[in-house]
Structure formats: structure tokens, C-alpha cells
């Protein structure tokens, strides 16, 4: 739920948004709303396009951004993980490689999904400005 709200808010800020979904029907729905979509696992996509991402948001509470995925993204990327604990990002790898990664684990559970997206937008706007 939070991922959908977040994707919508990012698109309203004129961002190009790519949504990763396991189910083909969910990817089709994302594309119907104007988002790009990719299937899990992410590695094949990131090997080809990973350096193009400025921001990566994770809402999956299991490791989907492991060292294998992260070595294929730009060192300039900002990763924001809002999944429930334990999160889905290898933060040890991020620290060791001086990647900008924010742990906001469980944020949607602490606030409503809409409010969480608004909070994240403020963080992004501060980072951009």
C-alpha cells in the first residue's frame, strides 16, 4: 500500500518511477498508471540499468537489495528502505561502500501510508535542494 502511494507522489513530482513487482498483473496495473515496471529478481534489470537510478525505495521486508544488486547501482544513488524489520537492504554493504542509504524501517506502520509518503517527499525535497 505504501509503495503505491509513494510511487504516485513521486510521479506527481515529475519523477520517472519504476515499480518492481512479482506478479505480472501487478506490473500491468503499474504500467496502466504510467509507471515503468520490472519483475523480481532485480539483478538482471539492475545489471543493465542500475547506474541510471538516483533513488531507490524499498518496501519489501526481506533482502531484495543484496550486495549483488547494490554493486550494480551508482555510488551516488540514495536508497531509502521503509520496509518492516529487518528491511530489504544490505546496509552493511552500503556502509562499507559509502553509499547513501537511509533506514526508515517500519515507517508505514508508524504512520498511515499516505502520511509516510508525505514524510519521504520532504526528505527527498531537502536532499534535492
Go through each PLM region and give its residues:
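Hydrophobic/small residue at the entry helix of a nucleotide-binding pocket
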Residues: 1-3
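Short Gly/charged-rich anion-binding patches and loops
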Residues: 5, 25, 89
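Aromatic pocket-lining residues of Rossmann-like dinucleotide-binding sites
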Residues: 6-10
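NAD(P)-binding Rossmann-fold cofactor-contacting core
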Residues: 12-34
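Rossmann-like adenosine-cofactor binding region
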Residues: 30-107
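Active-site capping/gating segments
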Residues: 87, 99-129
Amino acid at each position: 500500500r505504501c509503495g503505491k502511494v509513494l510511487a504516485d507522489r513521486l510521479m506527481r513530482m515529475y519523477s520517472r518511477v519504476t515499480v518492481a513487482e512479482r506478479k505480472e498483473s501487478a506490473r500491468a496495473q503499474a504500467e496502466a498508471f504510467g509507471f515503468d515496471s520490472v519483475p523480481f529478481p532485480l539483478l538482471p534489470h539492475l545489471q543493465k540499468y542500475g547506474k541510471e537510478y538516483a533513488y531507490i525505495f524499498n518496501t519489501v521486508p526481506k533482502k531484495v537489495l543484496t550486495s549483488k544488486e547494490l554493486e550494480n547501482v551508482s555510488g551516488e544513488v540514495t536508497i531509502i528502505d521503509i520496509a518492516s524489520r529487518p528491511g530489504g537492504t544490505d546496509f552493511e554493504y552500503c556502509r562499507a561502500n559509502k553509499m547513501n542509504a537511509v533506514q526508515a524501517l517500519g515507517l508505514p506502520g508508524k504512520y498511515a501510508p499516505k502520511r509516510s509518503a508525505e514524510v519521504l517527499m520532504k526528505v527527498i525535497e531537502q536532499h534535492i535542494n
